[in-house]
Amino acid sequence: MAERIRPYRPADESTVVGVWHRAGQAAYTFLPTWQQFTLGEAHQVFQQVIVSHCELWVATREALVVAYLALKKSYIDRLYVDPPEQRSGWGSRLIEHAKALYPEGLELHTHQESLGARAFYERHGFVAVRFGISPPPESAPDVEYHWRPNADIAMRVRGE
């Protein structure tokens, strides 16, 4: 099975937006704005906000995009895995890719209620540094996480 991480291409747009929309709908059942977010709106946001401001990477299996990562330098803006592909290592591969690109450290925000995402990031050495509220339209409680390479080393030494 040919699996790889590669840079995003414009031809990936429909597949990537579909992954993002499906994963968001499944993950954010607690956010009314997400449940009302249409695929058409997702395409608009993707073009206006994500493609124009982020470095994009996709994870593929047999040339099919199954996950994507959007970075604003060392800030993980988005990381989504298609629901049928979740818990298959794609998110971990993308996190490791981001760590290789930005070995000095990474930051991200996720929703406080996203317990699965929070556990995932914490398993990868991210530490919660601030609790707050996400910007509109969500305006939901969020958590800011940081990863620093020395934290990973300390976790390995302690056997975590």
Segments predicted by a language model, with ranges:
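Conserved beta-strand in the GNAT
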Residues: 58, 63-80
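Residue-level recognition of the GNAT/N-acetyltransferase active site
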Residues: 9, 77, 82-86, 111
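Conserved GNAT acetyl-CoA-binding A-motif
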Residues: 101-113
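Short glycine/proline-centered loop/turn elements that form peptide/ligand docking sites
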Residues: 91, 95, 113-117, 133-141
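Conserved acetyl-CoA pyrophosphate-binding loop and the N-cap/start of the following alpha-helix
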Residues: 84-85, 89-98
